[in-house]
């Protein structure tokens, strides 16, 4: 007997991941967050509300360094909250920098984290300070809406210090895309900004997302050749700016990139975006919306481990995705235009832009802005912000560009750089300059191993090997994450470490220097000694046998150390 539509619908609903029900029943992301914030008996909120809180730009965390001791004392974990700002294109004014600095000093752990998606993160905010922190962020004309959660996340763009007029235009598109793809619910303003409450939520709608929002997070980034600093192939939607006669004419579109996977589950894998076509710049916002709705309608809502857009694209095929996109647009996107990437790192130090302005790219190891006894980075940047008349651009490599510096201000800012001993990184090895690490311990609940706190010291030991091999000047990308979620985009690095357990990592080799190719597992679950013992002969061979201009990632493939990865489906093979 044939099943009725109602029966089929009920059976389908039974298969959904539990979070799909939570979103559907959350009253458009309200849940009981407000009540949880008001509860003085715990530093936490409910498990369900922690999942909804992500859509508001915050994660509940605890200090994992203190877990065991607090458990022995029969105390609840040392709960705190991370807040992530929505900052399309990573551009902030000096006034906004000062506001972020104040928030970090007054409510967080006195540091700022510049993320791999070009925004600010605050760590260590106590529940009683969470709402005040949110208000202070909004008072600076920034917000945290959709910085996390199953929605479009912070839209990235190339912080190009060369062509200021092109950068301004693509940054505007990053902002337009971000604003257009925001959730429409009033929940954020009600909870954090004391906005007027919607009395009848049945009147509230999410015309683009619907009550369940997306199956998983969604990421968009804009690259501007020759720089692939945003790692365009790691994005769910990658936009590659096409400039003709010094005019931005449109974007090549890639679909289905993503870094995350699950250890031991070969059905999960990182993937590079595939070229879909070219679109005129005037249509790019609509194109992004239509692609997002394809993921909304076709994405996997039964298994969150296979819910990212990359799996949807792999399941349907790029041609089917393009066909569906053309149908939803009502017109056909064009064939991709020619372009070429040369690198995915930052251009450090002073660079002259057009119209007579200057830009200084400051090297900030792993994006952590803090003061230490011998390096007053946070204080120095505050002093610069107090006099700077241009803007600040957070780079996708966790560095900072002091941008649009007038000739009149350049000497004053250089004086502050000298006074505080700030560095553009040119005195470091190419390996350290091209390094990235996620936060991991002690705050990230997903971390299996150290990352930000460990990578700098590991690099120092690898640098000894580079010096021995005579390749310490070579630009080599190295990245580390404490878990396989891929926040520092490790699967695209020439050398990568993904945490498996405290002190143990999977080591991957052979990513593309331009961010165009995934790397390959070389050794599994190894500690520092084996890491160094494994790398030494490879680096020695690289020093002796590399071709002129050959990057390390290309060398390890040519020499047979690892096989070339052509796409996510053969990442584990």
Curated annotation (Swiss-Prot):
It catalyses: hydrogen sulfide + 3 NADP(+) + 3 H2O = sulfite + 3 NADPH + 4 H(+). Component of the sulfite reductase complex that catalyzes the 6-electron reduction of sulfite to sulfide. This is one of several activities required for the biosynthesis of L-cysteine from sulfate. This is Sulfite reductase [NADPH] hemoprotein beta-component. The gene is cysI. It comes from Staphylococcus haemolyticus (strain JCSC1435). Belongs to the nitrite and sulfite reductase 4Fe-4S domain family. InterPro entries: CysI, NiRdtase/SiRdtase_haem-b_fer, Nit/Sulf_reduc_fer-like_dom_sf, NO2/SO3_Rdtase_4Fe4S_dom, NO2/SO3_Rdtase_4Fe4S_prot, NO2/SO3_Rdtase_4Fe4S_sf, NO2/SO3_Rdtase_FeS/sirohaem_BS. It is an enzyme of class 1 (oxidoreductase). Siroheme binds at residue 487. The keyword 4Fe-4S applies. Alpha(8)-beta(8). The alpha component is a flavoprotein, the beta component is a hemoprotein. Its EC number is 1.8.1.2.
